[in-house]
Amino acid sequence: MLASATGEFTQTKGKETMARLLGEFDDIDVIVCQNDDMTFGAIEALKEAGVKTGGVGEPVLISFDGTRKALELVKEGVINVDVECNPNSGELLAQIINDLEAGREVDKAYYMEEKVFTKENVDEYIEDRNY
């Protein structure tokens, strides 16, 4: 690993951070962004530096969230992999909190379905993506 840096979960900071890292390192093989907004910023910085992603011999770009915009970039081959972080889990969490506050018993474990999106499977999911 060459470096670990934060883009503070924003597109602007993601772009700034990626631009700085591109200035520090000549050969970046893999870029992992912990959310799609930082990835969008990183993509801007990469484009401005003339660096393409996703293809053979190009940096691999991995993102987290699974937003529709990111899935479109997966389909285009700009992002190699996007791992879902389902925003709909908040409703379940609110129900669990309400149940606990009401003194009701809740399950000890809950599992949310998450997906991993690649160019090979993204077409199955992109049309139904509502976030």
Model-found features: residue ranges?
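A residue-level marker of the well-folded mature domains of exported/periplasmic proteins
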Residues: 1-131
